[in-house]
């Protein structure tokens, strides 16, 4: 019997809290080996720098390798999440499928940020600001 592959595109619901959690994890240890400094652009939009992105702000990330400066925005972070989820060699699956009261799929997907450790947050940020994994 012959098998066939079909490529499907999923839509993933990402909450403001998910964005805050990913950026917090990245800033508190995920990206510290290649990012020497993170700086809020403009006014703080939340209490912490990690809340800047989910509220539509920008963070400047200063690369420890030379004079490179990367700007992280919400759109870039969402693209980084997309690229991470498409990476077939990703260390963890961070998506979950929504189910109804009888256990059937609702066709909706979300992020399980309990699966986003420093490695995953780093990969998402690298995909977001560099388009690929540069440092590992």
Q: Where are the regions that the model predicts?
A:
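Acidic, proline/glycine-rich low-complexity IDRs
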Residues: 109-135
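Surface-exposed polar/charged interaction patches
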Residues: 25-29, 33, 51, 83-91, ...
